[in-house]
Swiss-Prot record:
<dbReference type="GO" id="GO:0030553">
    <property type="term" value="F:cGMP binding"/>
</dbReference>
<comment type="pathway">
    <text>Purine metabolism; 3',5'-cyclic GMP degradation; GMP from 3',5'-cyclic GMP: step 1/1.</text>
</comment>
<dbReference type="GO" id="GO:0019933">
    <property type="term" value="P:cAMP-mediated signaling"/>
</dbReference>
<keyword id="KW-0862">Zinc</keyword>
<keyword id="KW-0677">Repeat</keyword>
<dbReference type="GO" id="GO:0005829">
    <property type="term" value="C:cytosol"/>
</dbReference>
<comment type="function">
    <text>Plays a role in signal transduction by regulating the intracellular concentration of cyclic nucleotides. This phosphodiesterase catalyzes the specific hydrolysis of cGMP to 5'-GMP. Specifically regulates nitric-oxide-generated cGMP.</text>
</comment>
<feature type="compositionally biased region" description="Low complexity">
    <location>
        <begin position="69"/>
        <end position="83"/>
    </location>
</feature>
<dbReference type="InterPro" id="IPR023088">
    <property type="entry name" value="PDEase"/>
</dbReference>
<feature type="modified residue" description="Phosphoserine">
    <location>
        <position position="92"/>
    </location>
</feature>
<feature type="domain" description="GAF 1">
    <location>
        <begin position="154"/>
        <end position="304"/>
    </location>
</feature>
<feature type="binding site">
    <location>
        <position position="643"/>
    </location>
    <ligand>
        <name>Zn(2+)</name>
    </ligand>
</feature>
<dbReference type="InterPro" id="IPR002073">
    <property type="entry name" value="PDEase_catalytic_dom"/>
</dbReference>
<keyword id="KW-0021">Allosteric enzyme</keyword>
<feature type="domain" description="PDEase">
    <location>
        <begin position="526"/>
        <end position="850"/>
    </location>
</feature>
<dbReference type="GO" id="GO:0047555">
    <property type="term" value="F:3',5'-cyclic-GMP phosphodiesterase activity"/>
</dbReference>
<dbReference type="Pfam" id="PF00233">
    <property type="entry name" value="PDEase_I"/>
</dbReference>
Length: 865
């Protein structure tokens, strides 16, 4: 193979590389010098990357780790060649297994917060730099510097040490470091992080002096703007040099070496400056000085980049913690607008280091003015007065900027109010103390959720330097953070205003309920009349025939039905056992009667009274009384009388389809829940509290049974639960000692009494069926007229001829099996079953007769045709 061929060179290449590497190891001085002169930023970054190791975690131990390593290439190749698989998760769940700071912490007072205290971590001390000029030791110094960079994130301290290292190479008299910053208008400027670092100077001395330089002005500004280094032999001969600093410090600047510091995107993030070469070359910086300076500044760029990332992460973490605290605050405090805004203002002042915070609330009735103003100053943080806005402080609040922001709906950031010419009041020498004390100002509108309406304005005055206490302008970060703050302000204001509106609505509701309960209660004259009759004489149950299952109320007046009800309470020993006052009982009975609507054909007071009479007959004549407790008997009788209170003559289906407000209150058994609520309202109305003699536990138990009994009258619930009851009866496993079976039995008993009209003697049953049909047909007419739907046959007036067959179907599907089961529990309830069967026969006969009539009519019509 020929000498010049690629193959020959490649064959000898490994041996040459080894020789070169060995020679470089033996000549460290040359290696370091070559690296400093020739190394690029990419080489330095690659050098760092090579030394960043990821340590695999293997639960199977060393063996498992070895196995995983040995087969990793096979797995990766299979993964690459396979079909689309499960997407790789960016964050593994195991990442959260590492020890992290708790999300929620407690402060010294035990208050729960998302805002953690600043963590004080012990850091390794910086290695003191060595200033010997031995080039053979420069590599060691460089490695020491790299070690410090990898373990520290303090920009000032690291750059101070870098300058001291540089001093050993280029021997300048002074060094300075300037960082690039932006103001609220995104205009760049330079701030000194280190100024006049000299041999023997301390970090504190170099970092105390803070100087601001304009962009593209002066030597430093020019280097920052162009991104190119400058090596000036005589500063006073350069027109870009600003001699004011020398005049202030009394220092004579001669030669300057100024270089930009760039990040990985080649953006200028800072400028380093060396002043006055101390020895050699006539006091001017050489080309070697430039290369050495540039090499070390590459490390400055790395330091700045890492530190900026770290500071950004800390700032974002702090911001998130504060915003989480604000979110927590909003959910904790919703009752008082003043309290929540006081806490929000305190958070803003302490976090953003401002002198004053004022929150203006827009007047809803007059959008050109503010309804309330909440003002706080930094001196008040420790006091946190109960009242933020005081009359004596009115002259310390400036409303004009807030009014401007409210009208424009845009943020306002004024770096120096005295120099701003946009507002006429800033140019007038009014002598206003408030105007004179404002230097920098940041004002942001607080908008509602729809972002199209300003509900308030947040105004911050005078941002303070953390160390010096001097006023400085608000920057873009402040604007962004305040924008986030006012979102939470808006949420807090809206939530609190909604809470206050709900409280006002509840107060109005209480007044309305008070008025309704007054009008819902029976009149005093009617109560006294019934009380007088009851005191004179109340006929016996036998005389009134209220123990008969065949009882009819058609011949009784409303007053007589009330007397019958009093007799029921008396004969069931409820008046005596629960210390009911006769006046209260009379008023309650008449109030219940009053709250049934008279324009409803069937579900009115008479139906409720008949349900209660059937319950009384079942308890007495049906011998069920001895199976129940006194509280259960009391609850059942109250429920029977109240189970259809305020019935509107329509069923639950109509309420839902018509989108009645009642449908929004309950998800099921709409009318039954409403009946119970009405029952509860009457029981709690003054003068109607027949349960006042009960203990707290007895009262709770009674209300629970009443509610269950009233809800049980919903036929949908009855159909859902009856199977279990019938199965227990069929298997002869029914046991009233079991609480669940007892509750089930009370529900079935309530339904049996509610449907008891189907068991009455035929003349009574026919008359009641007509009332039911009238009510159902009225609902059908409303469905056709209001909802534009065709009603079901049961509600359809045009299907009136189907009433007999529908009654037979109703008895077979709903009633018959219920009364059969009830008779198994108590044989004395057989009259209910017997009456139901007899009425079925009557309805069946009518249905057959109507069917024959219909068939005959169709035959006659066919013959005529």
């Amino acid at each position: 193979m020929e000498r010049g061929s690629p193959g020959a060179g490649a064959a000898r290449l490994p041996r040459d590389q080894d020789s070169v590497e060995a020679w470089l190891d033996d000549h460290r001085d040359f290696t370091f010098s070559y690296f400093v002169k020739k190394a690029t930023r990419e080489m330095v970054n690659a050098w760092f990357a090579e030394r960043v190791h990821t340590i695999p975690v293997c639960k199977e131990g060393i063996r498992g780790h070895a196995e995983s390593c040995s087969c990793s290439s096979q797995q990766s190749s299979r993964a690459d060649s396979s079909a689309p698989g499960t997407p790789t998760r960016k964050i593994s769940a195991s990442e959260f297994d590492r020890p992290l700071r708790p999300i929620v912490v407690k402060d010294s007072e035990g208050t729960v917060s998302f805002l953690a205290d600043s963590e004080k971590k012990e850091q390794m001390p910086l290695t003191p730099p060595r200033f010997d000029n031995d080039e053979g030791d420069q590599c060691s110094r460089l490695l020491e510097l790299v070690k410090d960079i990898s373990s520290h994130l303090d920009v000032t301290a690291l750059c101070h040490k870098i300058f001291l290292h540089i001093h050993g190479l280029i021997s300048a008299d002074r060094y300075s470091l300037f960082l690039v910053c932006e103001d609220s208008s995104n205009d760049k400027f330079l701030i000194s992080r280190l100024f006049d670092v000299a041999e023997g100077s301390t970090l504190e001395e170099a970092s105390n002096n803070c100087i601001r330089l304009e962009w593209n002005k002066g030597i430093v500004g020019h280097v920052a703007a162009l991104g190119e280094p400058l090596n000036i032999k005589d500063a006073y001969e350069d027109p870009r040099f600003n001699a004011e600093v020398d005049q202030i410090t009394g220092y004579k600047t001669q030669s300057i070496l100024c270089m930009p510091i760039k990040n990985h995107r080649e953006e200028v993030v800072g400028v380093a400056q060396a002043i006055n070469k101390k020895s050699g070359n006539g006091g001017t910086f050489t080309e070697k000085d430039e290369k050495d300076f540039a090499a070390y500044l590459a490390f400055c760029g790395i330091v700045l980049h890492n530190a900026q990332l770290y500071e950004t992460s800390l700032l974002e973490n702090k911001r998130n913690q504060v915003l989480l605290d604000l979110a927590s605050l909003i959910f904790e405090e919703q009752q008082s607008l003043e309290v929540i805004l006081k806490k929000i203002a305190a958070t803003i002042i302490s976090f953003m280091q401002v002198q004053k915070c004022t929150i203006f609330i827009v007047d809803e009735d007059c959008s050109d003015s503010f309804s309330s103003v909440f003002h706080m100053e930094c001196e008040e943080l420790e006091k946190l007065p109960d009242t933020l806005t005081r009359e004596r402080d009115a002259n310390r609040i400036n409303y004009m900027y807030a009014q401007y922001v409210k009208n424009t709906m845009e943020p306002l950031n004024i770096p120096d109010v005295s120099k701003d010419k946009r507002f006429p009041w800033t140019n007038e020498n009014t002598g206003n103390v408030n105007q004179q004390c404002i230097r920098s100002l940041l004002c942001t509108p607080i908008k509602n959720g729809k972002k199209n309406k300003v509900i308030g304005v947040c105004q911050l005055v005078n941002k303070m330097e953390e160390n010096t206490g001097k006023v400085k302008p608000f920057n873009r970060n402040d604007e962004q953070f305040l924008e986030a703050f006012v979102i939470f302000c808006g949420l807090g204001i809206q939530n609190t205003q909604m809470y206050e509106a709900v409280e006002r609505a509840m107060a109005k509701q209480m007044v309305t309920l008070e008025v309704l309960s007054y009008h819902a209660s029976a009149a005093e004259e009617e109560t006294k009349e019934l009380q007088s009759l009851a005191a004179a004489v109340v006929p016996s149950a036998q005389t009134l025939k209220i123990t008969d299952f065949s009882f009819s109320d058609f011949e009784l007046s409303d007053l007589e039905t009330a007397l019958c009800t009093i007799r029921m309470f008396t004969d069931l020993n409820l008046v005596q056992n629960f210390q009911m006052k006769h006046e209260v009982l009379c008023r309650w009975i008449l109030s219940v009667k009053k709250n049934y609507r008279k324009n409803v054909a069937y579900h009115n007071w008479r139906h409720a009274f008949n349900t209660a009479q059937c319950m009384f007959a079942a308890l007495k004549a049906g011998k069920i009384q001895n199976k129940l407790t006194d509280l259960e008997i009391l609850a059942l009788l109250i429920a029977a009388l109240s189970h259809d209170l305020d019935h509107r003559g329509v069923n639950n289906s109509y309420i839902q389809r018509s989108e009645h407000p009642l449908a929004q209150l309950y998800c099921h058994s709409i009318m039954e829940h409403h009946h119970f609520d009405q029952c509860l309202m009457i029981l709690n109305s003054p003068g109607n509290q027949i349960l006042s003699g009960l203990s707290i536990e007895e009262y709770k138990t009674t209300l629970k049974i009443i509610k269950q009994a009233i809800l049980a009258t919903d036929l949908a619930l009855y159909i859902k639960r009856r199977g279990e009851f019938f199965e227990l009866i069929r298997k002869n496993q029914f046991n009233l000692e079991d609480p669940h079976q007892k509750e089930l039995f009370l529900a079935m008993l309530m339904t049996a009494c509610d449907l008891s009209a189907i068991t009455k003697p035929w003349p009574i049953q026919q008359r009641i069926a007509e009332l039911v049909a009238t009510e159902f047909f009225d609902q059908g007419d409303r469905e056709r007229k209001e909802l534009n739907i065709e009603p079901a046959d049961l509600m359809n007036r045009e299907k009136k001829n189907k009433i007999p067959s529908m009654q037979v179907g109703f008895i077979d599907a709903i009633c018959l099996q219920l009364y059969e089961a009830l008779t198994h529990v108590s044989e004395d309830c057989f009259p209910l079953l017997d009456g139901c069967r007899k009425n079925r026969q009557k309805w069946q006969a009518l249905a057959e007769q109507q069917e024959k009539t219909l068939i005959n009519g169709e035959s006659s019509q066919a013959k005529r045709n």
